[in-house]
């Protein structure tokens, strides 16, 4: 009896590709939150010039820091309640799982650059505050004022509006009517109203970026100046691995943007990557993450971008009356330019 020929399993996809003629991979891939086109281009240029996925993430986020994307990245934006602009950033390498991050970074413009120095020159993951600034100076970064006339004007206007909105609660004087300094609300003073956050959804436009190199190596990163009028010393989700962004060469990568104080409680980027590891499509993975948060905070402002190891990507956002679509940027080998795409919120 004649023996049946058995083709190696790995050869079958190749033959199928040849039969279909077109078999190009979508890699490399650059994916980032919001329509920050120049950041996407900067990351792609880094790849085109022979750079790594990590190089591309750093270049893309650095471009946004320089251009002050949306007023919510880089210097001169989102003054805290003392009028100071501080920065958060993170960069993660999905092959080694190495991470470098900075939070509440002061007087240093290139936050993503400092984050990479943390990754490359320390065994730590996150440095914060004045100590992060001292580290940056030791790495050669220039100490300079991050405030601008625009950020100073924002702060002055906020003070004139009795410090509204702010992020205090259960304190006296009533934070919904007055500026601080505040003290804890005593047990016998519960008749004083508890302040609720009233800030609109603008100003949360963190750049989150995912890059997959043509070799399959993955990196992700974030950069932001946080939320306007935050309490001095506040650190958001952006520099927290698994919250702001997450990368793993064996599964994919994700990045989040929005209300960091809520997002970080759910580690959305990590969770999205784990969904993709389990076989979920990137869009479904992003949607599942948003749905998990909706159960507890139905009115939260946030979005997530996701990409798996094949270069397939997706995004999702939480639908609000003032936020029904989320825009993000894509650049891969099948496109000849950075392309803005939109997804309807759920």
UniProtKB/Swiss-Prot annotation:
Binding positions (substrate): 234-237, 257-260
S-S pairs: 64-69, 163-179, 286-306, 317-345
GO cellular component annotations of the record: lysosome
Its EC number(s): 3.5.1.26
Extent of the signal sequence: 1-23
An example molecular function term from Gene Ontology annotations: peptidase activity
Residues glycosylated per entry: 38, 308
Reactions listed under catalytic activity: N(4)-(beta-N-acetyl-D-glucosaminyl)-L-asparagine + H2O = N-acetyl-beta-D-glucosaminylamine + L-aspartate + H(+)
Compartmental location: Lysosome
Gene Ontology process terms (BP): proteolysis
Top-level EC class: hydrolase
InterPro entries named in the record: Ntn_hydrolases_N (IPR029055), Peptidase_T2 (IPR000246)
Keywords: Autocatalytic cleavage, Disulfide bond, Glycoprotein, Hydrolase, Lysosome, Protease, Signal
Family matches, as Gene3D superfamilies: (Glycosyl)asparaginase (3.60.20.30)
Highest taxon of source: Eukaryota
Post-translational modification: Cleaved into an alpha and beta chain by autocatalysis; this activates the enzyme. The N-terminal residue of the beta subunit is responsible for the nucleophile hydrolase activity. N-glycosylated.
Role, per record: Cleaves the GlcNAc-Asn bond which joins oligosaccharides to the peptide of asparagine-linked glycoproteins.
Subunit composition and interactions: Heterotetramer of two alpha and two beta chains arranged as a dimer of alpha/beta heterodimers.
Protein name: N(4)-(beta-N-acetylglucosaminyl)-L-asparaginase
Protein species of origin: Macaca fascicularis (Crab-eating macaque)
